[in-house]
Amino acid sequence: MEAKNLTARQVLGFQKTIGFDEVRISIASPETIESWSKGEVRNPETINYRTFKPEKGGLFCERIFGPTKDWECACGKYKRIKYKGVICDRCGVEVTLSRVRRERMGHIKLAVPVSHIWFLKCMPSRLGLIMDMTAKDLERVIYYEDYLVVDPGKTPLRFKQLLSEQEYRDALAQYGEEAFVAKMGAEAVRDILKQIDLQALANDLTAAMEGTRSKQLKKKLAKRLKLVQGLINSETRPEWMILEVLPVIPPDLRPLVPLEGGRFATSDLNDLYRRVINRNNRLKNLLQLKTPDVIIRNEKRMLQEAVDALLDNGRHGRAVTGAGNRPLKSLSDMLQGKTGRFRMNLLGKRVDYSGRSVIVIGPELKLHQCGLPKKMALVLFEPFMIRRLRELGHVHTVRTAKKMIEKQDPLVWDVLEQVTAGHLVLLNRAPTLHRLSIQAFEPILIEGDAIRIHPLVCTAYNADFDGDQMAVHVPLSIEAQLEARLLMLAPLNIFSPSSGKPITTPTQDITLGCYYLTQPPLKIKVQEQKRKPLFSDAQEVIFAYNDGLLQMHDLILLKNPDYGRSTVFGDKNKKVIETTPGRVIFNQIWPPELGFYNKPAGKKQLGEIILKCYQTVGREKTVQCLDNLKELGFAEATKAGISIGIDDMIVPAEKTRIISKAYEMVNVVERQYRSGAITDGERYNKIVDIWTQATEEISGVIYKSLENNLGRPEYNPLFLMVDSGARGNRQQVRQLAGIRGLMAKPSGEIIERPIISNFREGLSVLEYFISTHGARKGLADTALKTADAGYLTRKLHDVAQDVVITMQDCGTNKGIIVQAIYEGDEEIVKLSERIYGRVCCDEIIDPMTGRIVVRPGELIDEKKAKEIEEAGAEKVKIRSVLTCESKWGVCASCYGLNLATNRMARLGESVGVIAAQSIGEPGTQLTMRTFHIGGTASQVFKQPQIRARNDGIVQYIDLRTVKTVDNHFIVLSKSGYLAVLDPSGRELERHTVIVGSIILIPDGEMVKKGQVFVQWDPYNVPILTEKGGIVEFRDIIEGVTVKKELDETTKQISTIVIEHKHDLHPQILILDENTREVIAFYGIPAGARIEVKPGDKVVAGQRIARTPRKMVQTKDITGGLPRVAELFEARKPKDSAEIAKIDGIVEDGGIIRGKRRILIRDPQTGSEEEHLIPLSKHLIVYKGDVVKKGQQLTEGPIVPQEILDVCGIQELQEYLLNEVQEVYRLQGVEINDKHIEIIIKQMLKKVKILDAGDTSFLWEEQVDRLKFEEENRIIEAKGGKPAVGIPVLLGITKASLDTDSFIAAASFQDTTRVLTEAATLGKVDPLKGFKENIIMGNLIPSGTGFRTYRNIRLVEVAPPEFKEEKKEQKIYGNGEEPAKEQKWIPQAGT
């Protein structure tokens, strides 16, 4: 057996397309344009109105563009293929295929040169840059308003000076016609461009850049130099930006189609070309006739405008319109936007052999099957049918086979069965938000018109059966079928790529059936039951149950099947377990390795069981279990017949008590407000909080009352549905049977009066009216936000599309440090969850036993992650894509597990696209969620206290505190934190505490687990005095810096600081009681309320003023999505915070130009930084505070770019990661960190050059980090001076447009700008990413198309075996590895 080096495609008889490795774009010279052309178009006519034949020399001329009929010249002298290539002597048309009319171009010779609008008007204007003129001046010249001095001669005129009509006449009169040359229009510009020596200009610019200090000038010179270098490198002359010859695109790309009634529909381009030709011909005639200059100039300007309109209509002046005032579509419009060439025809093609239909549920299907209507299959598999009919000898020609199929001969159906057996189809549901929206299934032919799908894949497709439609595609080639079977088959996609959790989890009826089956017995029944029968095995229980001797939820004793053996769920210590017949039946479908599951199994638990099942027994058995689970769930739900009635919505008895208590508390707050103890804002916040707590309390109580079901001897169906996760959620139940709660105004504010009623009791007219607000806004929001979410997904895709696994291990020892995430005192993300599936950087040792848990470079699986957590590790350093050092793409070790397959990521896996899908998909889903809750305010109530999570010793670290009368401590400093230590001094937990918090336990004392040891006022930010003394006011002047406010309701007067223009700075000074010198002073921000009077005596820790916290707004994803977009776009948030640039001590620098000057001095180095902060911003640090680099000095969100500048890359990465995760976490969406890390990596891949050294970079140029390091390495090796650069943070839109690939950038946004830039610089597209390869018609360089798998050696196998296998329709196993004979398949497929 000899091995031949053949590629898979050659073996299967595919023709190799002409391959190319890169694509270059540059500006065409007039000679090039003429070389493309087959002839000049002189006649503006299109076709003859009588004969409907193309006019000679016109826009559809057959002599230029080729014949309209195959193998036939225009006059009909030569017909048929035998005259191929003959040029007719009568009509001059070449005898050839009419298809050439799609590729042959013509040209128009312009009477005068014309500027190309892209190079003139696309900002920054390339013509303006190279000529060093402003775009405005250039326009005046090009549109024939001013003269441009091309050659000043001996006159005092300057080169490139603009002269108005009058100035030109005066100059002529003064110096004479021969003395100087000044011209108008594009001709003048062309003459100047012709004089430019690019190399000399480049040298001059470089010298000028080195010689200047001005940043402004340097920036401008760098831009010009970049353009000049680009032109030199691409061997382009600048005068080619001025057109002398205009190409005419092939006629079949701008067709003229006859409609009925003798009218014609034409492409707008024909109208635009006709205008150009008409004006050009008229100008030629006028030039020969010695016409007055004014007329000629006007005609030249009109020609310039006609060409502008053809190239980019609407960019200059008003757009040229056609019938009905519609702007005509120019060449640029055909490229850009959703309907342009890139997005419509190159990236989104219509697919042959596809169909779509409504979907219905197919409960009888197996997971790898789908039901395909016979009518659809007949059309989709037609070519296969024809081949099979001929093979079987039923027909001999294709035509008769087609007729047979059309007639639907009974024989056809049998053949159809044979053809479709084992031939997979792909099912897709729009919107295709992630890769699980297209999966492969084996078609089962069914009657009827609807496609049937398996209930368990609905979650992945997000499909329901209220009229959803799905598309079917047939993979045709052998490779496509193979990939469908080995990679896309539904049983292979059990896990979600975004979180690694099972996605084929049961929903709705299946969940309900299983949950009902595994319910514990009712308490009443248990009391009635006399004895618990004992059974020896499951079979006995099932017999007894089937014979009616047992009820499903009777309590029974069963001999423990897991006694003495370790299983996942079983209890190996008990000999007998207490269970119910229902649970015994439920356990029959799971493999015995899992053990006996003896708890109620709701949606969440079922997901857990599926995951454990996969980990224990592998995929094949799990898939069988899933199908059994589906059968069981449906059967039991049907038998149980669970349905809800109005009596099942039990309003809890405690509701009235809770509400009256809330009303009392509200009255107390109102009284406090009326007595002036609190402000209106505080009153509002307190009332909202009271009702939020009351609503939460009622929610808890409802659940209890539903579970008890008023003591009836049956399960409450509403409780079963919600508790199992089958239907509805807690909020909906609360609204049905509890309290509707607080509602939001359309502005997002919460209305402080809640809706007390629920739907069971019915709403009053007023309550109903209030609730319409939120419900309507929800619907409007959903419609608007879906588009935003889709756009975010698209931007993410574009930025991450070319991130692929390119190597196994890049060998770096860098990584990131991760730890568990806490919110308040609750652990919300465990350490084990964050490190699972990642590669460890450092050795981790169990401190108790000294055993090595994980070695460097080892993958942390679930078991290891648990062990690390149990070993008490707080922080773990793991490999991350953020620190990956692979040339392009990322390496498998830095990425870790592929969550969808639970295996290490493989070469060629497109992790970037998966990251984009994982982040974008929940965004789209979450916008739909508002729609279901119906406008009730979801308000997160935060406890204003900290509880200890462990027993330990409290330690104050860098905290400044003041002791109060009752032995508590008030926190005065912003920096520092509280720690809880174990007896050996190891830190167990740490908490940041806000200024004004009261610590209830002194430093060094013990705290018990669960004990509250810090409290604070949730409604105000206090300003506290650190020293005791006498109060004195400074710059607190009524009517200027403060106002006295009389509250109408409370009749109380309060002093409020107001915004003011004067150079005054309200401060409260504290004077020493004896010496009367100033010992402390506090700036009071606008909006604060002063609580002391001059001359008052205060003690340390007393509150002297307070600023109310902001009003409460609702939190939902609509607030979240814009936040995610803001983070990924790296926008500067409004009202952003100021952050400290160095470590040091805060000093007050007084007030300068209406801003507060803060100095931070580092006592070690003596360096200091100053910050100028607007007076309206509230400072959260005080004089003498110790601050760390990057710490906030004022309130507000932080600017990401500043974190990068001050703290460096790692802090920024951590900040972005945590901020994005927080938004998703709030919605209960799980996304693995690695996906967000990939996007952040792409945002940080550029470096800004500060000093180019001896490299070829330019000042302030943004270059790829790897390119930067590579170039530096080369220069350093030669002993030169390397470049210096700083990392920059780009928003995802900017990062997408800044890729190496101009094709990908052009297909994303700003098409004309991208192409203009690419053409002037002569860019080369290396075709590395996905989009550019799809556009060029190549396989994408990822997955099976990855370069490693492209050229695989095939081993020839003896033909008989191969054929034998082929006959049997089962070449490949059931979703597992393919048969052994074809050795090449596993490599190609995986």
UniProtKB/Swiss-Prot annotation:
Signal peptide: none annotated. Its EC number is 2.7.7.6. It is an enzyme of class 2 (transferase). GO terms for molecular function: DNA binding; DNA-directed RNA polymerase activity; magnesium ion binding; zinc ion binding. Residues 1365-1390 are annotated as: Disordered. Keywords: DNA-directed RNA polymerase, Magnesium, Metal-binding, Nucleotidyltransferase, Transcription, Transferase, Zinc. Zn(2+) 2 binds at C810, C884, C891, C894. Belongs to the RNA polymerase beta' chain family. This is DNA-directed RNA polymerase subunit beta'. The lineage of its organism: Bacteria, Pseudomonadati, Verrucomicrobiota, Methylacidiphilae, Methylacidiphilales.
